[in-house]
Amino acid sequence: MNDLLKTKLKLIPHKPGCYLWKDEFDQIIYIGKAKDLYNRTHSYFNGPKDNKTSKLVSNIKDLEYIVVNNVNEALILENNLIKTHRPKYNILLKDGSNYPYIMITNEQYPRLKYVRTYDKNKGIYFGPLADSTNKYQLFNLLNSIFPFNKCNHQPHQKCIYYDLHRCINQVQPQTYEKAIAEVKEIFKGNLDHILAILENKEQHAVAKLDFENAQKYAEQQKALTYIINSGLVQLDNNESFDVVGFYEKNNYLVIIIFNYVKGKLLNKSADTFAIYDHEINELITSFLMQYYSQNRISTKIIVSLDDDNLLALSQRFKTKFINAQTKFHKQILKLAFDNAILYFDSNIKSVINKQNELDEALNQLKQILKLPDLSMIECFDNSNINLSLPIAGMIVYQNGKLNNKLNRKYNLMTTKNASDYHFMIEVITRRYQRLVSQHQKLPNLIVVDGGKLQVNAALYALEQLQISIPLIGLKKDQKHKTNAIVLANGDEIILDRKSVLYKFLANMQNDVHNYAISFLRNKHTKSIFNSLLNDVQGLGKKRLNELLNYYDSINDLKSASDQELLQFLPKNVLVNLREKLNKI
């Protein structure tokens, strides 16, 4: 422990708050909360420690702390700080790991949607749902049974789904309320009423010799029963609650959440984490803060935690976080813990191997480049169509893992002397001129997709900005496969295709290429639409964007029926559009 850290530790007060451990590069590597900051921070340096906690402690060179009024405030602050900094040694939910929901919008004419974000102000949510494939089948089935609104058209307009008898169009609010009530019952596992309705429709169709619809209703009954029942475990009571089980071994932690609705298990989610802190209560609490900040929360959560954290979570989410108190709750909690053990045993080898491969790849890259830290890597790729519509994409790796929230897209403005060289100069200049002007931290490494040309262009841009950041290129072979690292001095290091470093860099190059090319395709499609259709009378920017969001190409637009297009356009504009499309 250095003298600076010793001095700061002596000055920490016996008050609640958050502490931020930093490494020798001033990077925040771990964030925690405490009822007593002094006692909690000193506990890291007192007494025996396991290997992973020792690894964390050995990297601690400095700290910051923030004092708050109570543990509840500390819990909220900790969650916000973790979201912002995503420290290396914290438990982090994977980016985009939100579980799916089936949602009924709160619009005047409600729609049924399959979504991965939860916002209680936008509608009624059912979930979270674990099995994406099965639950998407359920979504399609519900959409076929209940004719919710299928589009964004005005209520006086009929759409293609209306003609297929799959869209209600304009109806009385009571009709929607009835459909919503039926969906709620289905998600409670109460199928008797809807199955009776479908059976009645089947018999009515048979009586009319309408065997096609009779078969459809029979298949809907069978599919609905299978999908719902295959995902349910029935309890002997009618409670709704979540159960959190966990298991820790060899510095790895499995957390499982069971979601029960009206006595039926609707969902099981599981995550595995490497852990570097010995306070399991704090780790579980941090995870639950992240999880329930982006997923729907039950009215009761049963979890084995200390009273302080249970109270803080309850106050934060305004719901009950409790220890198992009844015999029944203890049995359910034991089931969750048993499942966590089974999940650990079946998945831990894969988790450890992936983490070891990532650590080894980063260590190999550090050795090659003689860099002590690679916690932040920014990777660039430019793309264009014969030097027109130039764009660039930037992806960001934090501690070796892609953080999609930090990715950026650039519409490049270079027109004079347009070339790959000048496009690279522009994007590097724009990116780091902004970081410097906003006093933001620079990355540990810049990676450009390309060879000496792209590397030299990026170096020139950095020189003009008078900043120094380590930089390499990733060069492909004649088969367009990742082949070599191009150093700033122009030297090339051929990669061993069997190495973990090759796998890491090849994935990085593919990720940035796919990110950039996807952006270019969207821009190209929009450009074609604009150039071909900008003179269609009545087709303004708003309507054109609606068509762009729905149709991938001019050919798709040409093959669309009038019924489809009338969802977006008045009849007179549709006539003008058809005249234009017939000339293309």
Swiss-Prot record:
Organism: Ureaplasma urealyticum serovar 10 (strain ATCC 33699 / Western)
UniProt subunit comment: Interacts with UvrB in an incision complex.
Localization of this protein: Cytoplasm
InterPro entries cross-referenced by the UniProt entry: ConA-like_dom_sf, GIY-YIG_endonuc, GIY-YIG_endonuc_sf, GIY-YIG_UvrC_Cho, RuvA_2-like, UvrABC_protein_C, UvrC, UvrC_RNase_H_dom
Sequence ranges assigned to domain UVR in this UniProt record: 192-227
PANTHER family, per the entry: UVRABC SYSTEM PROTEIN C (PTHR30562:SF1), UVRC/OXIDOREDUCTASE (PTHR30562)
HAMAP family cross-referenced by the UniProt entry: UvrC
GO cellular component: cytoplasm; excinuclease repair complex
Domain GIY-YIG positions: 14-91
Family recorded in the similarity comment: Belongs to the UvrC family.
GO-annotated biological processes: nucleotide-excision repair; SOS response
The protein's role, per its UniProt record: The UvrABC repair system catalyzes the recognition and processing of DNA lesions. UvrC both incises the 5' and 3' sides of the lesion. The N-terminal half is responsible for the 3' incision and the C-terminal half is responsible for the 5' incision.
PROSITE patterns according to UniProt: GIY_YIG (PS50164), UVRC (PS50165)
Protein name: UvrABC system protein C
GO molecular-function terms, A-Z: DNA binding; excinuclease ABC activity
Signal peptide: none
Keywords in alphabetical order: Cytoplasm, DNA damage, DNA excision, DNA repair, Excision nuclease, SOS response
DNA damage recorded as keyword: yes
